[in-house]
Regions:
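Short, locally clustered residues in the helix-turn-helix/winged-helix DNA-binding domain
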Residues: 42
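A short, conserved structural fragment
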Residues: 2-14
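Inter-lobe coupling/hinge segments of SF2-like helicase ATPases
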Residues: 25-31, 35, 39, 47-499, ...
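Conserved adenine-nucleotide phosphate-binding loops and their immediately adjacent elements
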Residues: 13-28
Length: 506
């Protein structure tokens, strides 16, 4: 039939990318505070290549980003919009698609490899995306005429790729990428990292502040609860104080929503032998293993290795193995016992391993199908929920007691960000902050939302102890199958480095 001319054969490439036309809408006008910040950013870009936008939570930074993107697109250039978490792309994609339609491309690791290859090839072709929205790996996409890079929530440590190689920090790498195109970089956050704030106030970066919340929404009221005394009095209901239980109950009666934050996934951070104190540790990393009840296994959260749960203690033979601490999995079980009628969801790495899992959890919460959302740091990162009136930070101490010079900075950032999810519209939100260390300066700084004081405290300490931003740290990692050879090589290398660098080598 083809030979007789009845049929004709056409070859058409069928891709996985959405190529249909989308109806777009006009961008929202900026309020006076946003307009002033927007003009200040443009002024900074006339003098500096990098600008830090320090805006409080719910101040409407995303609308400023959209106006800036539109200006760059009018000039015929491309935009890279970086986010720290895949979860954030779900909400922001809808906002950006309404404005930019199919000029917007999405890129992150939850897409299949074949789909990511198509995006890569599209960027190399003649019909490339003008705006790329993605996570840290997006910086490696090919661009032809990059004009602006936006790094939202620039303080997040998830921008740093640790393992596997290549090891890089997407914020710093994006600044280098922009310099290759002569493009500008906007760093946006409510809680800047100390290094970025130092660069801003020292004049290396431009600096713009946005201190008003959108539509005059009040900052949430943060109430401190000392759980150390309550635990001694045996008044705690699992990880929940009586005050938090009361507020959750009242919020549910008002048909409002609740977020419970605990930056530890799994059921229990560790198990321990009640008789001899033995704690199972990872054979690769030598850190305690986290118990996951749903999978009935022990998992190392550093390397991902899994172990069977022992029936008895291998050290003394006792069968009295106790769960110590609590993670999001246990919180989910406990809250269902207290509020059996509530609709509860959990958002952590274990429940969001697929591309659609994020979207379903967030969509259900937005549509009011979920009453209580339990989560790790995923719930703290820029998500907007209109009906959240109560946020519970279940144990602030777990964020503070890390052997890391950035632990207090990161604890402040996490608590301030998750507190910002409360009271989004028409009502001041309430944050219940549970801690055993109520007198720590960083706790007081969270309550008063005093970022400047946190910065000056941390900056003074780091200058004394020779930490960034005053010094740079280089970690040299050596590995060999024979320990004696490794020790000898490490000593020899340290001696050579000390001959040139002196006491700066540890």
């Amino acid at each position: 039939l083809v030979e007789k001319g009845v049929f004709e054969i056409y070859y058409q490439e069928i891709g996985r990318l959405d190529k249909g036309m989308l109806k777009t809408t006009d961008i929202n006008p900026l309020n006076p505070a946003q307009q002033q910040a927007y003009q200040s950013v443009l002024q900074c870009f006339r003098e500096k290549n990098v600008c830090l936008l320090h805006g409080v939570t719910s101040s409407g930074k995303t609308e400023i980003y959209i106006h800036l993107i539109q200006e760059v697109l009018k000039a015929g250039k491309q935009v890279l919009y970086l986010l720290p978490e895949i979860a954030l792309t779900t909400q922001i994609t809808e906002r950006l698609k309404r404005v930019f339609g199919h000029r917007l491309g999405i890129y992150h690791s939850k897409f299949p490899d074949a789909e990511r290859v198509e995006i890569w090839q599209k960027q190399l072709g003649d019909e490339e995306y003008d705006v790329i929205l993605g996570v840290r790996s997006s910086i490696f996409l090919p661009f032809k005429n990059l004009g602006l890079v936006i790094v939202d929530e620039e303080h997040e440590n998830t921008y740093k790729q640790q393992d596997p190689a290549p090891r890089y920090h997407a914020r710093n790498s994006s600044i280098m990428l922009a310099s290759m195109f002569g493009a500008k970089v906007l760093l946006g956050t409510a809680t800047p990292c100390v290094e970025s704030y130092f660069n801003a106030i020292s004049g290396k970066y431009g600096f713009v502040e946005l201190k008003e919340r959108y539509q005059d929404i009040q900052l949430p009221h943060i109430e401190l609860v000392d759980i150390k005394e309550l635990a001694h009095q045996k008044r705690m209901q699992g990880p929940f104080s009586p005050r938090l239980v009361k507020e959750i109950k009242e919020a549910l009666e008002r048909k409002e929503q609740v977020i419970l934050f605990q930056n530890r996934r799994g059921f229990a951070p560790m198990i321990e032998c009640h008789t001899c104190g033995w704690v199972p540790k990872c054979k690769n990393c030598d850190v305690s293993l986290t118990y996951h009840k749903g999978l009935n296994q022990l998992t190392c959260h550093y390397c991902g290795y899994t172990y069977q749960v022992p029936r008895s203690c291998p050290a003394c033979g006792s069968v009295e193995l106790m769960n110590r601490g609590f993670g999001t999995e246990r919180i989910e079980d406990d809250i269902k016992l207290i509020f059996p009628e509530a609709r509860v969801a959990r958002m952590d790495l274990d429940t969001t391993r697929t591309r659609t899992a994020y979207e379903k959890i967030i969509a259900d919460f937005e549509q009011g199908k979920t009453d209580i959302l339990i989560g790790t740091q995923m719930v703290s990162k820029g998500l907007d929920f209109d009906h959240v009136s109560v946020v519970g930070i279940l144990n602030a101490d777990t964020m503070l007691n890390y052997p890391d010079f950035r632990s207090h900075e990161r604890a402040f950032q996490l608590m301030a960000q998750v507190a910002g999810r409360a009271g989004r519209k028409n009502r001041q939100g309430l944050v219940i902050l549970q801690t055993k260390s109520p007198d720590l300066p960083v706790i007081r700084q969270v309550i008063s939302n005093d970022y400047e004081q946190l910065y000056y405290d941390q900056s003074a300490e780091r200058q004394i102890f020779k930490y960034p931003p005053y010094y740079r740290l280089i970690y040299v990692y050596l590995k060999h199958r024979k320990e004696d050879v490794l020790d000898m090589a490490a000593d020899a290398m340290a001696a050579q480095l000390r001959s040139g660098l002196g006491s700066r080598v540890l």
